[in-house]
Amino acid sequence: MKWNKSILSLLSVLLLLILAACGNKEEKTAGAEGEKEAPTEESYTIEHAMGTTEIKGTPERVVILTNEGTEALLALGVKPVGAVQSYAGDPWYDHIKDQMEGVEVVGQEDPVNVEAIAKLQPDLIIGNKLRQEKIYDQLSAIAPTVFSETLRGEWKENFELYAKAVNKEEEGKEVIAAYDQRIADLKAELGDKVKKEISMVRFMPGDVRIYHKDSFSGVILEQLGFARPAEQDKDDFAEKNATKERIPAMDGDVLFYFTFEDGSGEATELEKEWINDPLFKNLQAVKTGNVHKVDDSIWNTAGGVIAANKMLDDLSEIMKSK
């Protein structure tokens, strides 16, 4: 009997040890699985104007330091925590101000307010070499920083970079595809009207410019297939500081002009002086009633995807009636 009791006791102890071992194994397995399921912060590398930058995770607190970059983020569904002030508006362009509520102003494109940027504790800063190259190292010390190269001409180049930087490359492709479809549709609707020569002039404080093809609006006109007057059919930006002797170079089948006003009233006075000049009144576009004043923010200053689409709205409305 004693021997049987000893055997039973030994078996009971062995059973408990086996159960305990199984329990430990399950806990370790569960723990290992838990470790596997724990989220990892993926990183990606962006090549840009200043080199390469590694970004961890999808940025949630983005500071943008160009006007066209602000439009890019908004089109991608990203509301920045900070942005540079618009060149016109207080502080944002009229066509984006409803989307910018709560966004902090961090200076202008040049100069930006580095201290204000740091206070926002961004996880990504997007800027531009042309505007902010000298402070790149300061910005990089605050957060991962990506710079575009230039601000002139084709807006899509910078847009694609910004989309990659905020980890929304696919969304960016959709935005561009939608825009390209608008270009194709409008071009088809206009038909032979794109053969009309389109002239563009800008009035600024102390400066009058005749715009060529490598400008924001010039690129869009070319995408639609519009002809340009011989004096403007050039692959550079613009003729700056034009004198009144150059007014004949402003002629075209249709003339669009836009005025950048800095609040001094100087540009508006310059505009009035020039459009009332006998040489200007003698332009064929004036005589045929084909001169149109358009919004400078849309046709030039903002320079982004939202402005590009609004410029298409203007062209559709005006040119379909020609």
Model feature map: region roles:
Residues 23-26:
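Bacterial signal peptide processing site
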Residues 17-21:
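C-terminal motif of bacterial Sec signal peptides marking the signal peptidase cleavage site
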Residues 121-126, 144, 252-253:
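Proline-aspartate-enriched helix->loop->beta-strand connector
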Residues 134-205, 302, 306-322:
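Extracytoplasmic substrate-binding proteins
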Residues 254-322:
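Structured C-terminal subdomain patch of bacterial secreted/periplasmic proteins
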Residues 90-92, 132, 149-161, 197-219, ...:
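Extracytoplasmic ligand-binding site segments that recognize negatively charged/polar headgroups
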Residues 61-73, 173-227, 231:
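Basic- and aromatic-lined ligand-binding clefts that recognize polyanionic substrates
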Residues 69-116:
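A short, structured surface patch at a secondary-structure boundary
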